[in-house]
């Protein structure tokens, strides 16, 4: 009885376990059957790594293409604007240049006419035709005047002799001799050719004193190449002014410094020295493109004593000498500033 009951219980347990396994298999089959192809076994969405990059690549290429096209169009528009602005600027420059050239030509013609003192009288240029002896050509003459003063910018120039000769019916060769009012030793000669119809300048040559050639010839040569007689005469006048001022300054410094040191000079430099050092002041006459003077001056020194202690002391004394020189000149002018600095450097107890 008890054995039969035990076998029944075992059969029931076996049947229940088999039922559980069957139900689990059915459940698993249902889960697999209802799972989408785009999901994993755990039910998570599957990511297709092959399709998406291709789509993004196509989109990025198209967007990059649009950006490049827009950038090119923008650059082309900017280039077109720059070309247009450049053309407008070039046109404006040409208009202004033509106006300036016309004004300069008019001024130069009037200047030459005034310079040569051309009046209403005429000089006969002999072009008689053998077939018609009465045929002659006439042209304006330039009557010489002594000590002719020009406009205020070059008023110091004096013309002492004026000779002319007709080279053709339209060209007159003029020879002008003159000097500078405050430097009579600066005597010059100008040879010019002028077209009588419009007083246009065709040719210039010049002669100046030997002492002026070193500093004046370079600018004068460039001026005659440009046929700029105004700048040439202005340079003559201003050179004479600065040359005279420089000479007077050297004599002024020499008068005061010879009491305390040895002083010497040449055209461009002034030298002062004692047993310890030698000071040199340089004054050069230089010109800009219009013939105005831009003087260049500086100071330098040379140590003479070889004693280390003295060299050390003098080096400290002369340190930043250029800077001190510039300060003195800006405060007191070139002449007085140079004198005050030299007096400070050459006190009696130093040399």
Swiss-Prot record:
- Which residues lie in Polar residues bias regions? 54-66
Name the principal localization, coarsely classed.
nucleus
> What Gene Ontology biological process does one annotation of this record name?
mitotic sister chromatid segregation
Q: Which GO terms describe its cellular component?
A: inner kinetochore; kinetochore; microtubule; Mis6-Sim4 complex; nucleus
Q: Where is this region: Disordered?
A: 1-71
Question: Where is this chain's protein located in or outside the cell?
Answer: Nucleus; Chromosome, Centromere, Kinetochore
Keywords attached to this Swiss-Prot or TrEMBL record, sorted alphabetically, are: Cell cycle, Cell division, Centromere, Chromosome, Chromosome partition, Kinetochore, Microtubule, Mitosis, Nucleus
For bias type Low complexity, the affected ranges are: 7-18
What the record says about family reads: Belongs to the CENP-P/CTF19 family.
Q: Tell me, what does this protein do in biology?
A: Component of the kinetochore, a multiprotein complex that assembles on centromeric DNA and attaches chromosomes to spindle microtubules, mediating chromosome segregation and sister chromatid segregation during meiosis and mitosis. Component of the inner kinetochore COMA complex, which connects centromere-associated proteins and the outer kinetochore. COMA interacts with other inner kinetochore proteins to form the inner kinetochore constitutive centromere-associated network (CCAN), which serves as a structural platform for outer kinetochore assembly.
Subunit text: Component of the heterotetrameric kinetochore subcomplex COMA, which consists of fta2, fta7, mal2 and mis17. The COMA subcomplex is part of a larger constitutive centromere-associated network (CCAN) (also known as central kinetochore Sim4 complex in fission yeast), which is composed of at least cnl2, cnp3, cnp20, fta1, fta2, fta3, fta4, fta6, fta7, mal2, mhf1, mhf2, mis6, mis15, mis17, sim4 and wip1.
For this entry, the protein name equals Inner kinetochore subunit fta2
The source organism is: Schizosaccharomyces pombe (strain 972 / ATCC 24843) (Fission yeast)
Q: Which gene encodes it?
A: fta2
């Amino acid at each position: 009885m008890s054995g039969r009951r035990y076998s029944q219980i075992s059969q029931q347990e076996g049947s229940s376990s088999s039922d559980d396994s069957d139900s689990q298999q059915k459940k698993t089959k249902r889960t697999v059957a209802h799972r989408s192809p785009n999901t994993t076994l755990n039910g998570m969405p599957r990511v297709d790594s092959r399709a998406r990059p291709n789509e993004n690549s196509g989109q990025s290429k198209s967007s990059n293409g649009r950006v490049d096209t827009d950038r090119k169009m923008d650059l082309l528009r900017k280039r077109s604007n720059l070309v247009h602005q450049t053309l407008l600027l070039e046109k404006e420059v040409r208009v202004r240049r033509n106006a300036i050239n016309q004004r300069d030509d008019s001024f130069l013609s009037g200047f030459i006419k005034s310079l040569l003192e051309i009046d209403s009288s005429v000089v006969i240029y002999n072009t008689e035709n053998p077939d018609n002896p009465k045929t002659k050509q006439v042209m304006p003459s330039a009557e010489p005047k002594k000590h002719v003063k020009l406009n205020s910018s070059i008023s110091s120039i004096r013309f002492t002799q004026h000779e002319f000769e007709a080279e053709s019916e339209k060209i007159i060769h003029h020879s002008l001799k003159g000097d500078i009012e405050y430097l009579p030793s600066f005597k010059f000669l100008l040879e010019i050719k002028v077209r009588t119809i419009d007083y246009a300048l065709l040719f210039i040559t010049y002669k100046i004193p030997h002492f002026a050639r070193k500093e004046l010839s370079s600018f004068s040569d460039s001026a005659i190449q440009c046929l700029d007689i105004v700048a040439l005469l202005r340079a003559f006048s201003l050179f004479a002014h600065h040359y005279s001022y420089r000479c007077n300054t050297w004599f002024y410094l020499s008068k005061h410094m010879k009491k305390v040191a040895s002083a010497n000079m040449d055209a461009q430099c002034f030298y002062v020295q004692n047993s310890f050092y030698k000071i040199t002041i340089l004054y050069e006459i230089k010109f800009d493109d219009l013939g105005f003077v831009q003087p260049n001056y500086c100071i330098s020194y040379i140590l003479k004593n070889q004693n280390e202690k003295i060299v050390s002391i003098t080096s400290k004394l002369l340190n930043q000498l250029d800077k001190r020189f510039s300060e003195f000149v800006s405060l007191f002018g070139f002449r007085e500033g140079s004198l005050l600095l030299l007096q400070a450097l050459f006190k009696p107890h130093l040399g």
